[in-house]
Amino acid sequence: MLRSKRTKVVYKTADVILPPVEENINSENKNEGEVKVTTFADEPKIEQEEPQQKPEVVDVYSNETDKNEEEVSIITSEDEEEDEKGMLFKRPGGKKHNYAPSKYVGEEFDLDALKEHRKMVKRWIIGISVRFGFWFALLIPVAVLLRPYTIECEPINTFSEFSLCVILFLLLQAGIDLGLAIFSYRKVGKFLESPAVDEINILMAMKPTGGVMGNPHANTEALAASVKMGNIINVHRHKLGALNKAVKKVTNDESGSEVSSEDEESDQETLLRNRKMPTNSKTRSQLFRALKDLNKRTNQYSVKPEKVLEYSEATKGKRMSAGSKLISAMTVIPLLTILFFIIVGSSTITEIKSHLVLKGHDPNDIPTLCIATYSLNWFVLIMCVLQNLIRSAPIISHALKGIDRDIKEAYMKKAAEDDEDED
């Protein structure tokens, strides 16, 4: 019985090292690029290998053997659908290792957002400084006129002293905001200048291109580079997971909340998919502190009060941090002081006239000192009211929009239920 002859074709693989496949092939064909023709009798166990045209992804490590001989296999487009963004490796022993650079590295760690946030904090520093200077400028005349006004015009020191206390409170609030803004600005700047940023940029650049993934044989050096990049990314996999948890905790701290269920953790992980990066434990700790300092909402509550209600809604009743409670209280305190201030200030002009009568003066002939100090105190009151209205208006507007939205949703839900009942 005649046996048909079969050929075995060996292709040149350039500088790509594919252990242990290349070792087995080169052991039989020492001259690369040579086509060796053998009979079936000489190699009864060898089957013909035909090259695949434009394979999608190369299976570098394959455990498919034919009598202790390993061959290079090709992963088709069906396999690529299983891992759209990465490469599939089958290591000896049948264990499939899947790494996807874009899955772990993400599209981009948004360093630009940090820079923009830092610029925003810088604008806050300027705005808070102006506010601090304004109230400090009012503090000086109020303090200077306090004692003469009390002696000449006011039998009870309520109005002038209360005006002074309000200014001191607003200065304290502006001072805290200014200090935290400066601290955050410096910490974020220090992080942006740290080696961690270079490490992030290097890893983000280690993503194989679509051309290399689509036709690896077209550029073997690029294929080898992409394999190396993938291995490097895989080494950082556990570090990325640890950092993801750290950044996720920072995000929860932003909203003054704590994650309390696995579903919420999954949602946070989805939001942070593109914000993972490699770093060692020291850099991760430094990054965590920098981001936490940056995202402390203390200065944002005073400058952008509409965030207060947003985060309250986002927490869904979860426990707020002590800092969030403190800032929320500081936002409410001026509103309460305004009410008391108006009540006290409205009766002050009568008290001034009564005091002038006791001094033997004409109640209709009010001294200039009394008029100037009284007007200054009312100016402080008006400015305090305007400042708090400006800061509280977005919160009230947001609350009204939320109520209106809830009413519409409830109405639509009821209408849908009525339609179902009619059907």
Swiss-Prot record:
Composition skew (Basic and acidic residues), residue ranges: 43-57
Transmembrane regions: 125-145, 162-182, 326-346, 366-386
GO annotation, cellular component aspect: host cell membrane; membrane
Key word Cell division present: no
Biased composition (Acidic residues): 67-84
Domain of life: Viruses
UniProt region (Disordered), positions on chain: 43-91, 253-282
Main location: host cell
Compartments where located: Host membrane
Keywords: Host membrane, Membrane, Transmembrane, Transmembrane helix
Keyword Membrane: yes
Protein name per the record: Putative transmembrane protein ORF103
Topology versus the membrane: Multi-pass membrane protein
